[in-house]
């Protein structure tokens, strides 16, 4: 039994607490001044492992971004995957939004835990920040580190950030051989969905990029349905045949040659392909490249899952013949010669073509007949796509895009007339689109298109070689008649000459 006289007084308790707090503050200050920071971290981790040792049946994997000086792909995959697993009950999160991002990104802050289940196995993810005063974060969807600003396992403040994955030891093989590949696969799908397409162009032999926001899609392309379907099926087949290309010993790439008159949608088709596949686009201007070595360096700097476009390949640059004379004063092993056709072809289907996966190479030209035969060799450009004048099917697509018209229920009264007039090589899709944009009223826009089509067809007939020959023959006959009619009055000859001029014009 205790008596009140045995208890210390409140004053003595407060005095003892104040003395102890003072000693603790003094010891802490001395420790910070005398013990180096790395040793402090070591002592902290040791005490933490002693007092907070996990169960002997639990295995914890540490996933750091630093992989022997290189980025750890598993860390990046976990970062992306966990961004979709954040619990609504989370109490500490961080957000970010880069200038290229379309949405706000959520990611974990220091100490936050995410629970996951894989094949009935319970897993616990935890993001940890060691050292430094600034809190880190993880689970972001970008390619940056957990805190949003570092690239390695430790940031500029000496702060180490990593993920901890804890689970029962007996499931180690399942986690390493099945769960980790599953995370990498899911992260790739998430990045593809959220990927911001970029358009890269040359500036002083360096790639500069801007966000690609071209609205063209296969749904809005003024193409024949059969051709559109063939292109989509070819792209799908290319994407899913990675193992096939490896088995047959070919580089995982695809080449397309787009040819046809100007204004037929070649550039729009490139943008539609990029939007469909979620591929970046590299616009290569060969006139800016002086040597084969520069071309090789530029092409090696392109990313996988990208489209390389060389527009107007027939007139972009005059490429020398593939058999080049060695440059005087240069060693044979140096690649300092001028840009050659062989250098370009070597990257298309030569030894350098194997550098990179999921690459699409597109050449465009207005004049296929002017191309070097080496570019048209079978197997070099896998698919030749003719982008011709606007057909009635293409017109209906444009009418739906620009005027909201559809022939599914009740076609417009002018559709039959337009179908008759647009048949043949009369107008390009760009010309048709220009006419449809002149008015928001469908009747006015289509009537204007009919008038233009009639004029274009008349002009086409007049420029027909057969008709031109007939006109020239009649002109010669009229001239001979004027010369031979010397007895005719000047007024009569003048009238005949006026008729001749009117006929010719």
Curated annotation (Swiss-Prot):
The chain crosses the membrane at residues 11-27. One of its GO terms (cellular component) is plasma membrane. The keyword Transport does not apply. Coiled coil: none annotated. ATP binds at residues 260-267. PANTHER family: BCS1 AAA-TYPE ATPASE. It catalyses: ATP + H2O = ADP + phosphate + H(+). GO terms for biological process: response to stress. SMART domains: AAA (SM00382). Residues 137-151 have a biased composition (Gly residues). Keywords: ATP-binding, Hydrolase, Magnesium, Membrane, Nucleotide-binding, Transmembrane, Transmembrane helix. Belongs to the AAA ATPase family. BCS1 subfamily. One of its GO terms (molecular function) is ATP hydrolysis activity. This is AAA-ATPase At5g17760. Its EC number is 3.6.1.-. It is found in: Membrane. Residues 136-155 are annotated as: Disordered. Its cofactor is Mg(2+). It is a single-pass membrane protein.
């Amino acid at each position: 039994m205790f008596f009140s006289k045995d208890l210390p007084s409140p004053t003595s308790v407060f005095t003892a607490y104040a003395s102890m707090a003072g000693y603790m503050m003094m010891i802490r200050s001395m420790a910070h001044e005398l013990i180096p920071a790395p040793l402090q971290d070591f002592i902290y981790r040791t005490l933490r492992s002693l007092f907070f040792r996990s169960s002997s049946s639990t295995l914890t994997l540490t996933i750091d971004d630093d992989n022997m000086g290189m980025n750890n792909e598993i860390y990046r995959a976990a970062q992306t995957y966990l961004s979709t697993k954040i619990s609504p009950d989370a109490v500490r999160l961080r957000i970010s939004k880069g200038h290229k991002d379309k949405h706000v990104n959520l990611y974990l802050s220091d100490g936050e835990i995410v629970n996951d289940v894989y094949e009935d196995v319970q897993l616990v993810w935890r993001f940890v920040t060691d050292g430094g005063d600034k809190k880190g974060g993880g689970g972001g969807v970008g390619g940056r580190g957990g805190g949003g600003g570092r690239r390695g396992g430790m940031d500029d403040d000496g702060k180490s950030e990593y993920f901890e994955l804890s689970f029962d030891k007996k499931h180690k093989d399942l986690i390493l051989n099945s769960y980790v590949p599953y995370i990498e696969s899911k992260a790739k799908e998430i990045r593809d969905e959220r990927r911001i397409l970029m358009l890269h162009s040359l500036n002083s032999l360096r790639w500069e990029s801007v966000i690609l926001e071209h609205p063209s899609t296969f749904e809005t392309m003024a193409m024949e349905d059969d051709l559109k379907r063939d292109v989509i099926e070819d792209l799908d087949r290319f994407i899913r045949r990675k193992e096939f290309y490896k088995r047959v010993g070919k580089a995982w790439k695809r080449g397309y040659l787009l040819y046809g008159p100007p204004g037929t949608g070649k550039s729009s088709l490139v943008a539609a392909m990029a939007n469909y596949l979620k591929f970046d686009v590299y616009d290569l201007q060969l006139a800016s490249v002086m040597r084969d070595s520069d071309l090789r360096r530029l092409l090696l700097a392109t990313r996988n899952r990208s489209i390389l476009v060389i527009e107007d390949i027939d007139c972009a640059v005059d490429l020398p013949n593939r058999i080049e004379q060695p440059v005087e004063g240069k060693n044979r092993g140096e690649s300092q010669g001028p840009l050659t056709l062989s250098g370009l072809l070597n990257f298309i289907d030569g030894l350098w073509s194997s550098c990179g996966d999921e690459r699409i190479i597109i050449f465009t030209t207005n004049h296929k007949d002017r191309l070097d035969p080496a570019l048209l060799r079978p197997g070099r450009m896998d698919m030749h796509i003719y982008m011709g004048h606007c057909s009635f099917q293409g017109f209906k697509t444009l009418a739906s895009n620009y005027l909201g018209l559809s022939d599914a229920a009740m076609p417009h009264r002018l559709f039959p007339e337009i179908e008759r007039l647009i048949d043949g090589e009369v107008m390009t899709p760009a010309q048709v689109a220009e006419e449809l944009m002149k008015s928001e009223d469908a009747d006015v826009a289509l009537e204007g298109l009919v008038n233009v089509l009639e004029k274009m067809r008349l002009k086409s007939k007049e420029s027909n070689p057969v008709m031109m020959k007939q006109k020239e023959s009649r002109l010669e006959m009229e001239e001979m008649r004027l010369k031979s009619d010397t007895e005719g009055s000047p007024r009569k000859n003048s009238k005949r000459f006026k008729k001749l001029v009117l006929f010719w014009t």
